[in-house]
Amino acid sequence: MPSDRDHDAGIFAFFGAVPRSDRCRQTRGGGEVVDGSSVFGHVPVFAQRCVTLLAPALTRHHADGSNAILVDATLGVGGHAERFLTEFPGLRLIGLDRDPSALDIARTRLMRFADRVTLIHTRYDNLAVALNKFGYAAVESVDGVLFDLGVSSMQLDCAERGFSYAQDVPLDMRMDPWSPVSAADIVNNYDEAALADILRRYGEERFARRIAAHIVRRRAHTPFTSTAELVALLYQAIPAPARRIGGHPAKRTFQALRIAVNDELNSLSNVLPAALDALTVAGRLVVLAYQSLEDRIVKRVFADAVSSRTPAGLPIELPGHGPRFRLLTRGAEHADAAEIECNPRSAAVRLRALQRTQHGVEPQQPTRRGDS
């Protein structure tokens, strides 16, 4: 059960103990965290578009969002949550995040909405468990779900987290500091084949085998402890012509390790069906992805969700077997120049959204209807 200190104003419930922390609680200018999008220079990506897409679901009962529930499955420091709670003064919001430091900041930021907010410390693929734990059904209980994927600006800016290759810090990369495996654990202990597989699958690194071989040779006499040590090795392992194109030579390796440490792609694959199940009829799901591996998963799950459930080969649509969802976006939406100028992080975003149209739980492995 959550402790008393985790219930400021009797509202903020935490799924697991979340100690208050001063880690990385300053803005770039060194000041204390304050409410608003100035926190850590944090501006929520595509905030207005997310509001526009989710508003019809959140205002079905009342224009102010009363009786509606929104799950922000990647709460972070609360930028999107603050926007929705301000826009819809009757809305109830459930915020999930695995990062206790982010939750601590969001908790302060959203305190003025405390009577309408529940914050839960958990991975987002525990969505169904979290809903049940706090009194909500895992099926058809919420009006909207929002995912803003990837590493946050706060995590990148917090040097000690080890996400950035621009600083010499411990090789960590854990979104939840209590997670058992760090990037250093992977680099120092996984065998060469496993390392190469991680770099190839999660970083799409074409020099994966070469880098893995260099890592294994180096760690045999000196284990890796810092990001700078790994960056130096990558400069040695990647051929000079390749280093001069395609961005920083460490970019793909760091992405791959971060995804592996935090099990990001498996978590995403597992949570999307649960998020679809959680939506009420007319409920909406919005996902912001920042790299192609995430977006492919979202695209595939959405395509399955909007497909007919009539068995392949039948010449007609069986009654009651139509799709339970419809797409709200044509392909992935991208930020325009104005959005990118306001928020450079939005340059990489791919936004997809859909809406539930019928009752029913989605199968784990949906079967697509074939051509008649």
From Swiss-Prot:
It is found in: Cytoplasm. The keyword S-adenosyl-L-methionine applies. InterPro entries: RsmH, SAM-dep_MeTrfase_MraW_recog, SAM-dependent_MTases_sf. GO terms for biological process: rRNA base methylation. It catalyses: cytidine(1402) in 16S rRNA + S-adenosyl-L-methionine = N(4)-methylcytidine(1402) in 16S rRNA + S-adenosyl-L-homocysteine + H(+). GO terms for molecular function: rRNA (cytosine-N4-)-methyltransferase activity. Pfam families: Methyltransf_5. GO terms for cellular component: cytoplasm. The keyword Cell inner membrane does not apply. Its EC number is 2.1.1.199. S-adenosyl-L-methionine binds at residues 78-80, 97, 124, 148, 155. Its main location: cytoplasm. Keywords: Cytoplasm, Methyltransferase, rRNA processing, S-adenosyl-L-methionine, Transferase. Belongs to the methyltransferase superfamily. RsmH family. NCBIfam families: 16S rRNA (cytosine(1402)-N(4))-methyltransferase RsmH. Specifically methylates the N4 position of cytidine in position 1402 (C1402) of 16S rRNA. This is Ribosomal RNA small subunit methyltransferase H. It comes from Mycobacterium leprae (strain TN).
